[in-house]
A protein has these predicted regions:
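Carbohydrate-binding surfaces of carbohydrate-active enzymes
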Residues: 1-168
Length: 168
């Protein structure tokens, strides 16, 4: 009604082993979102997390995939790291990046959170448009046209669930 899309991410999305214990199955859970999302922490290079969300977005007619990224990357995570992580995820189908994080205040434990805030508290904040302008252009290209998918992969989570159950 107001033009807002519901988005978010699930817990323990990456593997067949992690999904049954945490949420049952990521693919079915993505149906609840108008923009399926993932949470890719630690600057890891995961294949399945982004591809599951992209597949769900295609199947359910969603306009793209959201990712919360850069979390748990530490204070020495530089612009090269930001670009590499964003490019990796774009190659796997992520079209909307939600950077983790910007502080309201550096008071208390916030000053020890990581990565460094993407906000005015960081000395490089005025230079950050170099990174964001790149992704603005890239995501404009990625959201034009329609995907032509000619390959199907069976997601075997039901078989995993039946064999191992929720507690094993």
């Amino acid at each position: 009604r107001n033009g807002l899309l519901l988005t978010g991410h699930m817990m323990e999305e990456p593997t067949l082993k992690s999904q049954p214990a945490a949420l049952g199955e990521a693919m079915r859970s993505y149906r609840s979102f108008q923009l399926p999302g993932i949470d890719m922490l630690c600057d890891w290079r995961e294949y399945t997390t982004a591809k599951q969300a992209q597949s769900a977005a295609h199947q359910f007619g969603c306009p793209g995939v959201m990712s919360e990224l850069y979390g748990v990357t530490n204070w020495d995570f530089d612009f090269r790291g930001h670009k590499l992580a964003g490019d990796w995820q774009a190659a796997l189908g992520v079209t909307l990046r939600v950077p983790h994080l910007t502080w309201v205040s550096m008071e208390g434990e916030a000053k020890r959170d990581y990565p460094a805030s993407i906000g005015y508290q960081s000395p490089w904040y005025t230079e950050y448009p170099m990174v964001e302008d790149h992704f603005a252009r890239l995501n404009t290209v990625l959201t034009r046209g329609k995907a032509q998918v000619r390959l199907g992969v069976i997601h075997p989570v039901e078989s995993y669930w039946l064999h191992w159950g929720p507690s094993e």
